[in-house]
Amino acid sequence: EMDLSHNQAVIDFFASFDKESYLTIFSFLGLGTILTFCMQSSAALMAITMVLCSSGVLPIYMGIALVLGENIGTTITSNIAAMGANTQARRAAFAHLTFNVFGVIWVLCGFYPFIDMVCSFVGVNPHADHIDAARLSVVLAAFHTTFNVCNTAVLIWFIPQMERFVCYVIKPSNRKDEDDFRLRYIGGTSIMKTPELSVLEAQKEI
């Protein structure tokens, strides 16, 4: 088993980056995106990131930048997989990409304060030379939760605009493709006031 904390080559590589530089953050974000796309597994790269951070080799800021890249990389994979699917599948994949890219953009605008705030929630000092592996897991979990909750809290108010944007970018290949996935019987708000009719309309859709 390789002890990364005593691997001088690995230590020197990560030490060559300035963890306080946005150039470093963007570099690791891009690296996380590319590696996730190549590995086809954000979970595997997340495990590697946790090992690097918990061993003290990779600073938490750079580790979270990798995680942000993983969030984008995994959506690129789903978009490629959906290329041969129907219009609705491609739109769903693109909406996922749009959601994550938007979240990454606003996090980058206040990257260091945001990470410091998340670390303070779980009582971790991000400037410490070594972060306990158990505490690091809590930091990464807290970051993922805070990131997704905040991103959802913002974008939930812009679902109609997001839908229009996604439909504008991903156009149906033909009219029939659009009609095949449109609800014909369920629509409006009045039907929801009568559960019996709702069941009947749902049966018609099926």
Give residue ranges: language-model regions.
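Structural signal for the N-terminal portions of transmembrane helices
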Residues: A89-F102, P126-Q161, Y168-V169
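Helix-loop-helix hairpins and the membrane-proximal interhelical loops
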Residues: E1-I34, L52
